[in-house]
Structure formats: structure tokens, C-alpha cells
Amino acid sequence: MAMLAAMSREVPPVDRVGGSSFAVHLAAAPEHIATFRHELRHWLQGLTLKPAQMHDILLAAGEAVTNAIEHGSRSDATQSVSVEAALHRETVTVVVSDGGRWIESTNAALTPTQHRGRGLFLMEGLADRLAIDGTDHGTRVTMHFDVPAAAGQRTGAPLSEPREC
């Protein structure tokens, strides 16, 4: 519980723009992945998604964050990983960014080694569209998930203030 309290001070998740988007910056440490998933799940539950769609988004986003922490930031908690998600019309877009250079392009990313690289295949299979861009300034994974028109509706009141874990 103390770790969650410390994380909430360092990495406050933000639900903004009337609840149609989500943004969080987290320390690049593996122990923050579960809390990130919890916060993303909370935001997704406010959308009228089918359970399978929510599961796909959570799983793919979790894989992208794990890769950003392990590869982009080398699990260095002084580094950070940024996640932004937004609902626009009938698409949920999730963007995961880090400051490291661990992949050059989508094609390079989808060439697995014998023991690694399956998470990228998983992301490709779950997302309707996947792009991975590596630059000298970092790596960005962008995933688009097509959702039905009803997903444009939120349940409950929209949030406009940052929430703490």
C-alpha cells in the first residue's frame, strides 16, 4: 500500500477532456505496471466497450508499457514512460512513449528473436492498427482499436480533475 501511495504522488494519472482521454506519466519501474493497468481499466470502464474489447486494449497497452520500461528505459526508475489514450469517434487510440531507442520501425519490431518479441506480435494481433516509431529521441508505440459507435458514450459523470491512485 505504501508503494501505491508513493506512486500516486510521483505519477498522478490524469483523466481529462471531459473523460474522453486519459494520460499518465510513470516511473520506468516494473512495479508500476499493475497500477497503470488498474488506472487504464478504470478509464476504459467509463466507455461502453464490450468486455473483449476492453481486455484487448488492456493487454496490448500493458505489453507496450512493459516494453517501454524494459527496453526503452532499461527499467531505470529515473526515466519515465508516458501513456495517452483517447476515444475519438469509433476508435480508441493508445500511445506509449519512452525516451529510449529500442526499435527502428514496425517491421523491425515484428521480427522476433528465439526468446523475445512475442509481445509485439500480441499487440499487432489485438490492435486494429499498430505503428512503432523509433527516433533518436525515443520510441513511440501507437495502437488503434476500432470500437462500435456506442463507445462514444460514457457512463457516469465525466472527470475533469486529476485523480490519485
Stretch-by-stretch model annotation:
Residues 63, 67:
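Conserved polar catalytic motif of the HATPase_c/GHKL fold
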Residues 33-40, 123:
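Heptad-repeat coiled-coil signal-transmission/dimerization helices
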Residues 23-35:
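STAS-typified acidic loop motif
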Residues 1-23, 69-165:
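Conserved beta-strand-loop-beta-strand hairpin that lines the nucleotide-binding pocket
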Residues 38-62:
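Conserved short strand/loop->alpha-helix "switch" segment adjacent to the catalytic nucleotide/phosphoryl-transfer site
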Residues 28, 49-52, 76:
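Structural signature of the histidine kinase catalytic ATP-binding subdomain
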